[in-house]
Amino acid sequence: MQYFFSFAMSFLLMSIYAIACAVATFIENDFGISAAKALIYNNAWFDMLHLLLGLNLIGVIFYNKLFQKKKYSILLLHLSFIVILIGAGLTRYFGLEGGMHIRENQSSSTIVTREEFLKITDFDTNASFEFPISFTPLTQKHFEKTIDLNGEKLIISSIKYTPQKDSITPASLKLNINYQKANTQIILNPNFTNKQVVHFNLQGKNFTINWGPKEIKLPFALHLKDFILERYLGSMSPSSYTSKIQIIDKQNNIELDYDIFMNNVLDYGGYRFFQSSYDQDEKGTILSVNKDPGKIPTYIGYTLLILGFLWVLFDKNSRFHRLSI
């Protein structure tokens, strides 16, 4: 136990963490953010690494009595890492990434997540169940999920995933579904509007299933008053595009006009809206949406980290100061 709460273990865990982040960067560059999340960021072993590193840093503080005045600079460094880890945890488990599509003179209060889900609904009870799934060029794992329906098990297992070949042939997912010893096989295509579902019947019970993102309702709406696209002189290439929107928050009796364009984002209600793309007829906008409750703790952690390093450099009790004498 004493070795686990040592500076040597801290160095080892931080080295593993740094290597994992570096590998994730290369994976993201070559295969996309979804592959990096599936293999590194959202993987159970990376969560465990966060936990071990946090416990190690807390243990080091107490085992080495860093609360002493002469060790305050080292204490600040350790506390900064702990705050950064807390911020990362908040982002991991409570953060949200998605998009919002709005046509001119229309309003939307719905975010469509980037993460894809498999959603199944029992018509008899109107109960719905959903769980995230992810298929990337590097992660095409078999999965099996069991759902309890009043004591009876509904088992959904993947058989084969076929990635998208071109713009005409979409990706497909072949599933086997078992209920009360009855089986059926279903082929799904990703459904990004959540309006198309597949119906099936097992042992007299009716179900629907679909594969696509989750829709999240916001407590406020955005109304697109106008979308403006500007082009380079003598060219059809867009130089900039702006979404002139109105925030409609009935709960707080707020109506506020705002322009969203490149490098000018909207922060409202804990969400951040970026200008992402637009419809081909130039009558609609596509906004990227981000909710990151770990952003502020992470910024605080990095600020403390910088202050801690500066303090260590000039602290008379630090090893750096003694070596410089």
Where is each model-derived feature located?
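Hydrophobic alpha-helical segments
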Residues: M1-Y41
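Intrinsically disordered or highly flexible coil/loop and linker segments, enriched in small
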Residues: S6, S10, E28, F67, ...
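Hydrophobic alpha-helical segments with strong N-terminal bias
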Residues: A8, I27, F31, N64, ...
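Active-site-proximal structural scaffolding
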Residues: L12, L51, Y72-L75, L79, ...
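Membrane-proximal extracellular juxtamembrane segment immediately upstream
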Residues: V23, I27-S34, Y41-A44, D259-I325
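Internal alpha-helical transmembrane segments
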Residues: A38-F117, N290-R322
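Soluble non-transmembrane domains of integral membrane proteins
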Residues: G99-D292
